[in-house]
Curated annotation (Swiss-Prot):
One of two assembly initiator proteins, it binds directly to the 5'-end of the 23S rRNA, where it nucleates assembly of the 50S subunit. One of the proteins that surrounds the polypeptide exit tunnel on the outside of the subunit. Belongs to the universal ribosomal protein uL24 family. InterPro entries: KOW, Rib_uL2_dom2, Ribosomal_uL24, Ribosomal_uL24_CS, Ribosomal_uL24_KOW, Translation_prot_SH3-like_sf. One of its GO terms (biological process) is translation. It comes from Paraburkholderia xenovorans (strain LB400). Keywords: Ribonucleoprotein, Ribosomal protein, RNA-binding, rRNA-binding. This is Large ribosomal subunit protein uL24. The keyword Ribonucleoprotein applies. Part of the 50S ribosomal subunit. One of its GO terms (cellular component) is ribosome. PROSITE patterns: RIBOSOMAL_L24 (PS01108).
Amino acid sequence: MNKIRKGDEVIVITGKDKGKRGVVLSVGEGKVIVEGINLVKKHVKPNPMKGTTGGVEAKTMPLQISNVALVDANGKASRVGIKVEGDKKIRFLKTTGAELSA
């Protein structure tokens, strides 16, 4: 069970974007893509087949999953725990104890 999932609000805890918040767009093997964070400029060639004009585009690059943490109700970074109730696993915030939606 992943502790960070698509749609979660996270805060960056290390790196050049430290302190910035965003929503997780996708989760991969040890990496997450967060909306509007870790932007890089990529040079793109014009391609009439794809409809691109070319030039310099800003692209969101993946971050290590260890460099982000979920945001609690107080706006602070929180670790995530997993507890088992019956046969279901439930994620919860370690700082407040609040349960997260599936």
